Swiss-Prot record:
Residues 76-385 form the Peptidase A1 domain. Belongs to the peptidase A1 family. It is an enzyme of class 3 (hydrolase). It comes from the Eukaryota. The modification Phosphoserine is found at residue 130. Its main location: secreted. This is Pepsin A-2/A-3. Each pepsinogen is converted to corresponding pepsin at pH 2.0 in part as a result of the release of a 47 AA activation segment and in part as a result of stepwise proteolytic cleavage via an intermediate form(s). It comes from Macaca fuscata fuscata.
Length: 388
């Protein structure tokens, strides 16, 4: 009997997963719009989502080129703690980057004044370094230092974790950001300064039983979304997971067979690449096919520079179908048209991709809300299944 009890406890321990609840909040874009600042922001900042994946120049060893405009539309945020005792921060869990950074008490910029700031002197486990970090965006850059401390995430105590502490945050637009910092979940190969990403550090310490994490994004206005470290919860999806090999280990990049509408190819006719990115809100692709899609769905530009459609037309619009590894993944108009403040905004966004990189798409939250997603580091693959 004792052995049966022991075996049962071992089996239970192997099934333990760590969930981080995500809360859906108003995006930075919406905050700027409500304060009458969006048009001016878009005018001053040459916003190209591709800059997240294709920095204009190779960065020095301790520089992280991570344009912050890419988080303009983010709505899902979770809480982590850093230090002993823990200091709480609201962060984006971003599979499109690999570094962790938060504001620090050394930052006196306007953008830092209304956000949580890490104080190293209040943590008994903080270790300083001589490293620096610079996170470029728009016309300025966020600069800071690198340090080590314990990170609390989903009930996990991730010790000796390297992270960035911002010292300057130029640009008043970050004042309206609904998040404090970023927690990157991509591969270590794209991590600035060779810093070990949070999930890698967690796995290396044996704090999760499986070398994978998964994401469920709810369409609910407030709650229900989660990041799951070390496991998969089948209650979040229907059917079975379909697995797609990672084509390039850096971002969570996969191969796409085609993108169709009404049975006809509208992009990616010869196959293309896509990055599955929780740190991008929209469905993003090369400028030309995106322009064609906007035209096909009847989208036109409003005074804020957003592409909008008639809300009454949504029910008559077709699905956009991504065929990946032989499986069709339809995205219905109810998913790719975003309703906000009485407007219906297209969930597609164009980006200027370097021509030598081929046709690249970003499958952001518009896609992930439809499909429970598993990021499997052990087997370098992505699992997809329709959400429950």
């Amino acid at each position: 009997m004792k052995w049966l009890l022991l075996l049962g406890l071992v089996a239970l321990s192997e099934c333990i997963i760590h969930k981080v609840p995500l809360v859906r909040k108003k995006s930075l874009r919406r905050n700027l719009s409500e304060h009458g600042l969006l048009k001016d922001f878009l005018k001053k900042h040459n916003f190209n989502p591709a800059s997240k994946y294709f920095p204009q120049a190779e960065a020095p060893t301790l520089i992280d080129e991570q344009p912050l405009e890419n988080y303009l539309d983010m709505e899902y945020f979770g809480t982590i703690g850093i230090g002993t005792p823990a200091q709480d921060f609201t962060v984006i869990f971003d599979t499109g980057s690999s570094n962790l950074w938060v504001p620090s008490v050394y930052c006196s910029s306007l953008a830092c004044t209304n956000h949580n700031r890490f104080n190293p002197q209040d943590s008994s486990t903080y270790q300083s370094t001589s490293g620096t970090v610079s996170i470029t965006y728009g016309t300025g850059s966020m600069t800071g230092i690198l340090g080590y401390d314990t990170v609390q995430v989903g009930g996990i105590s991730d010790t000796n974790q390297i992270f960035g502490l911002s010292e300057t945050e130029p640009g008043s637009f970050l004042y309206y950001a609904p998040f404090d910092g970023i927690l990157g979940l991509a591969y270590p190969s794209i991590s600035s300064s060779g810093a070990t990403p949070v999930f890698d550090n967690i796995w290396n310490q044996g704090l999760v039983s499986q070398d994978l994490f998964s994401v469920y994004l709810s369409a609910d206005d407030q709650s229900g979304s989660v990041v799951i470290f070390g496991g998969i919860d089948s209650s979040y999806y229907t059917g079975s997971l379909n697995w797609v090999p990672v084509s390039v280990e850096g971002y969570w990049q996969i191969s796409v067979d085609s993108i169709t509408m009404n049975g006809e190819a509208i992009a990616c006719a010869e196959g293309c690449q896509a990055i599955v990115d929780t740190g991008t809100s929209l469905l993003t692709g090369p400028t030309s096919p995106i322009a064609n899609i906007q035209s096909d769905i009847g989208a036109s530009e409003n005074s804020d520079g957003e592409m909008v459609v008639s809300c009454s037309a949504i029910s008559s619009l077709p699905d956009i179908v991504f065929t990946i590894n032989g499986i069709q993944y339809p995205v219905p108009p109810s998913a790719y048209i975003l309703q906000s403040q009485g407007s219906c905004i297209s969930g597609f966004q164009g980006m200027d991709v370097p021509t030598e990189s081929g046709e690249l798409w970003i499958l952001g939250d518009v896609f992930i809300r439809q499909y429970f997603t598993v990021f499997d580091r052990a087997n370098n693959q992505v699992g997809l299944a329709p959400v429950a």
